[in-house]
């Protein structure tokens, strides 16, 4: 979610849109101009920031900077290829498609991490299948069980999280380049299909000027559920690391200190961080749900929250 990555995606979307227009041959841009734009399109984050300080509009600042690079080597008096950049598009076409692409990128990372954690829990479930421990209900000793059961329970929960994440990834992998209020009055639907196909996104079958935020809210809800699983695992190990129990503990490397006042302590700080951060993820899901209800075909009340 760095600015550099966002701008790189913006650049690719704008270039692909120009190539789509050239492919159609309707608005006047030639294949040669599209190829020129592809070759010369660049941006400088610092320069974009400087322009935005004046325009107070991030998309205009980016397009201005990108256009300067595209036209820098054009001979004097020749038409400027940058005039075709962003043709018929709105800021939402660019920003929403890029955001969904970023969410896919981020979800892919999370999917791989959840897959790895699930495999670890599955492996440990078999390794510890005969390791006896105390089962507790209401925090009180109940009946004997095995550590393998704990790991197995976590493994299955992570498998369900993985299935939900894969579905949520598919649900958020959408793009929309449909112009003002989503009517395609200023841009041919072919451009949307062309750009989305090359980004690996589906094109939204009916967007307004923005991609409906139920896509994003669904992903946020799944992420909150996954965070709750991590919270559950971390909380269990924290409880088992209590001095009075000490059935399990997180790693504590050589030279690590537990307390400035009590050096004998081995605090479960990593697990506590997991529990704390899970609260942030779950709280952010509520924001995503609130972003679904926008005014008419678009407002930007969601934008500041998403940023």
Question: PLM features: what roles do these ranges have?
Answer:
Residues 178-182, 251-256, 298-305:
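A glycine-rich phosphate-binding loop feature that marks nucleotide/adenosyl-phosphate handling sites
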Residues 116, 120-123, 160, 164-167, ...:
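Residues on one face of amphipathic alpha-helical coiled coils
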Residues 122, 126, 196, 200, ...:
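Amphipathic, well-packed alpha-helical segments that form the structural scaffold of globular domains
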Residues 17-18, 103, 107, 223, ...:
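Buried hydrophobic packing segments
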Residues 1-184, 188-194, 203, 256-259, ...:
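A helix-coil-helix interface module used to build multimeric assemblies
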Residues 192-285:
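Acidic, glycine-rich loop-and-beta core segments that form the ion-binding/anion-interacting portion
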Residues 149, 186, 223-224, 302-303:
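Short alpha-helix boundary/capping motifs
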Residues 280-307:
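Long, amphipathic alpha-helical stalk/connector segments used for oligomerization, subunit docking
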């Amino acid at each position: 979610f760095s600015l550099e990555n966002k701008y790189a995606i913006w650049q690719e979307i704008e270039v692909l849109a120009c190539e789509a227009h050239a492919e159609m041959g309707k608005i006047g841009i030639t294949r040669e101009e599209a190829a020129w734009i592809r070759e010369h399109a660049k941006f400088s984050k610092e320069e974009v920031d400087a322009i935005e300080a004046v325009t107070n509009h991030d998309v205009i600042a980016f397009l201005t900077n990108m256009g300067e690079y595209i036209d820098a080597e054009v001979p004097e008096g020749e038409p400027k290829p940058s005039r075709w950049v962003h043709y018929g598009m709105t800021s939402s076409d660019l920003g929403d498609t890029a955001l969904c692409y970023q969410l896919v990128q981020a979800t892919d990372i999370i999917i791989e991490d959840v897959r790895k954690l699930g495999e670890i829990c599955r492996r440990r479930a078999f390794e510890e299948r005969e390791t006896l421990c105390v089962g507790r209900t209401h925090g009180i000793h109940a009946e004997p069980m095995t550590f393998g059961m704990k790991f197995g329970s976590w493994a299955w929960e992570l498998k369900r999280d993985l299935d939900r994440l894969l579905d949520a990834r598919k649900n958020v992998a959408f793009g929309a380049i449909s112009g003002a209020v989503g009517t395609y009055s200023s841009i041919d639907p072919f451009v949307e299909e062309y750009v989305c196909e090359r980004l690996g996104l589906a094109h939204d079958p009916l967007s307004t000027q923005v991609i409906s935020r139920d896509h994003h809210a669904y992903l946020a809800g799944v992420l909150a559920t996954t965070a709750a699983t991590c919270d559950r695992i971390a909380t269990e190990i924290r409880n088992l690391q209590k001095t009075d129990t000490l059935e399990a503990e997180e790693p504590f490397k050589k030279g690590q200190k537990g307390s400035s006042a009590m050096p004998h302590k081995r605090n479960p700080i990593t697990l506590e961080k997991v529990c704390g951060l899970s609260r942030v993820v779950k709280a952010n899901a509520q924001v995503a749900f609130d972003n679904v209800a926008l005014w008419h075909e678009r407002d930007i009340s969601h934008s500041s929250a998403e940023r």
